[in-house]
Swiss-Prot record:
Homodimer. This is Dihydroxy-acid dehydratase. The lineage of its organism: Bacteria, Pseudomonadati, Pseudomonadota, Gammaproteobacteria, Enterobacterales. Its cofactor is [2Fe-2S] cluster; Mg(2+). It is an enzyme of class 4 (lyase). The gene is ilvD. [2Fe-2S] cluster binds at C122, C195. It comes from Buchnera aphidicola subsp. Schlechtendalia chinensis.
Amino acid sequence: MPKYRSSTTTQGRNMAGARALWKATGMTDSDFNKPIIAVVNSFTEFVPGHIHLKELGTLVSSIIKLEGGVAKEFNTIAIDDGIAMGHSGMLYSLPSRELIADSIEYMINAHCADAMICISNCDKITPGMLMAALRLNIPCVFVSGGPMESGRIVVDGKEIKINLVDAIVYGANPNYSDALASRIENCACPTCGSCSGLFTANSMNCLTEALGLSLPGNGTLLATHIDRKKLFIDSGKLIVKITKEYYEDNNTSFLPRSIASRESFLNAMSLDISTGGSTNTILHLLAMAQEGQVDFKMSDIDLLSRKIPNLCKIAPNSDVYHMEDFHRAGGVIGLLAELNRVSLLNNNVKNILGLSLDVVLNKYDILKTKNQDVIEMFHAGPLGNKTSIPFTQSYRWKSLDKDRKKGCIRSYENAFSYDGGLAILYGNIAKNGCVVKTAGVKKGNLIFEGFAIVFESQEEALKAILENKVKKGHVVVIRYEGPKGGPGMQEMLYPTTYLKSMNLDEHCALITDGRFSGGTSGLSIGHISPEAANKGNIALIRNNDVININIPNRTINLDITNDEFLNRMHNEIQRGKSSYTPQFRKRFVSSALKMYALFATSADKGAVRKIQY
């Protein structure tokens, strides 16, 4: 039976100093026989997805105390990718994932906490916390702040749903009036919570639920809804329960690595592919697998993408459905149930409640359940009032979306496509692979041939798009924006959104060793590996080269001879110390980013740091 980790600092006469300090934080002698549970929060006033988390940490702490534990809260950093987007701030987003994971390890191990409950929500915070949980492998429960309600606006007498991406598109398109652009901006993000589409934040929170590390409903239940309060209360109770079971009964089944097995990773990735979720999830799942020592690689994702159907399209892949609609249709479990009906899931998995997949589906699948509490939870919907305060409304949909033919979630027989919403491409441009969100690509663009127009920075590409230098038939190549080359692997939401605002999104492709926001749609191919800074062939592309993209065949190739490839490679190497670095880009790189670049791997390895010790 494992000893409580916290006993290192709370037991024995020699730890009088540590106990004195604990007592200064409010602990008493009676607390030293209780589990110390870290409340790992990520509250910040910078991020709408985290603006409401301060009081939620207090709520969870109070529940832990009532259940017989000692709660100790600390905060991680949290970057808002939307605010950091389109300027040098985006260089810091992905590296912050590693800092979050490291800072949690530092706090947990330095203070010998017994367990932790992670309160996350947005893009790099959830994966950073997941990496830490799998690294530390102590009892852990995840509960996120919840999705934002979609924005609503009346245009030409018709109410439409909007989100952050619409604000960017309307703001960049000179054909829209200032008044309309301002109205969109003011209505796009109406409440606290993670942006209302299936962007990276909501994708990761859904995958946390699919992995089994959070309670059912965690990925889709709105931040503003009163039902989400119960999710936090139940999570607080659960972390105390499983902590005691581990330390007092030697029950290891609730540890993160016991739950997030290879089979769980395959199920989570299957869910992601079936939704056409953010391509960033691939990056994060690969990184998490390495932390948890799980055998899960890019090749597994490639195989899954060829057999998992695309059963669900949510903004930005849909103009109709947002997270609130996904929840109404049964959410994560509703979609898993459709995959399970055609035997596309691994059933040998359990979740944080200790329930098997079959039991979870029987209880929480809205097409099967008789449980009135479950049915009531999935009726939770948006009220439509602006607020940054959680749990302020109790609106219920009048009915659930059980339409599996044309509804938000479709059955296998009514799939959008049968080869999934995400795909891995290989070729002489990307020998180790690259990623495309096929759910966001129009059918006419699944096979595309175009002429390269090459840029060595996102900023340079943005300028060219807005100055009408990018034309129909171009393949926009943005290189030296990978984990090492950026450094930091910037998201390319602005280039893809500007292409859309210029009505070029269906007539151009964009390829990069950088990555894309979950809000990206169109023929946007990222994570090209090896990246340019790691001697990848994307560094050898020149203006007007012909590039062939064939998504059905999973290929991406530069149409030049092998001799020409070798010649270009020779010329690049001749640049000496400057080889495989940008020739024309001027960018300040701080010491913090230089440190990240020194150890960063390419995207096919999850952009984790490779450290030899």
